[in-house]
Amino acid sequence: HPFLPYERNVTTAEINLGRYFGYNHKARVGFEWEKKTFSNDEDTLEYYYIAPQGSYIYDTRDIYRDPSKGILIVQGFYSHVEFDSDKQNLWWSQSYSFYHSLVKRKRKLTAAFNVSYLTAFGDVDEVWVSWLGGVKTVRGWSIPNSTIYTNVDNAYRFGNHFAIISTELRQTIIPTSVFTTDLFNWKQEYGLSAIAFVDVGFINRERKKLFGELPMAGIGFGFRIPAPMIGTIGLDYGWGYRSSSGYPVLGAGKSRC
């Protein structure tokens, strides 16, 4: 576990089915069967559950020729139905992204804006608590460790509900191109983009108090290289701020928008 004093062991099986409805709509539904054990020298927590899950995506971008303009909306749910207890949990995630080309030349300048929201329903145990920090939430902040978690002054970084607002500027430096390698005639991509980002996030254990605390903010820059199958790889350097305090963090790059 990233910050609790447990070693995690997972046994899992997963089935998902999905399809496109036209060019812009995609739906997926499925479930996981999982057994997770969190253990240390003094205690063992065991969870045995089935996890129904699904998502719906609406995407107006031309992701193959021009993904720099359009709208991307993602709705998703993930739940736990435990076999050994009456506990049932549900997480509902929402993401709304907007893209616009400010400069439409070959080396484009694109603005992107995203609003994300996650909320949980049910009796959520501490091993499932969410956090802010890292490339998937608020960049410029590290993923919390046990030292951060046990310090009561850092309680603002953990919760069951969060909202994140992100803005990015993306400048194409080397336009993406495709070439064929000599080995098995595989096709590869190359290109390079630079980004600047600002993230602002709120998190709380109570939904009604979500926006009652000072937000966590991150600002920084990074680089992106296209990679087949996984989209892009990159590197970010960001500064995290809350109130008047701030510190720099270097991390693997991943766009939130």
What does each model-identified segment do?
Residues 184, 210-212, 243:
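Short proline/glycine-enriched turn/loop segments at secondary-structure junctions
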Residues 52-191, 248-252, 257:
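C-terminal outer-membrane beta-barrel translocator/porin domains of Gram-negative envelope proteins
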Residues 158-161, 185-192, 213-218, 225-230:
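A structural signal for short secondary-structure junctions
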Residues 40-43, 86-88, 208-211:
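Short, solvent-exposed loop/turn segments at secondary-structure boundaries
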Residues 106, 168-176, 193-219:
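Outer-membrane beta-barrel transmembrane domain signature
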Residues 1, 29-35, 71-79, 94, ...:
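Transmembrane beta-barrel strands of outer-membrane/channel proteins
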Residues 9-13, 33-37, 50, 79, ...:
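Transmembrane beta-barrel architecture of outer-membrane proteins
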Residues 1-65, 71-73, 136-151, 155-158, ...:
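Gram-negative/organellar outer-membrane beta-barrel architecture
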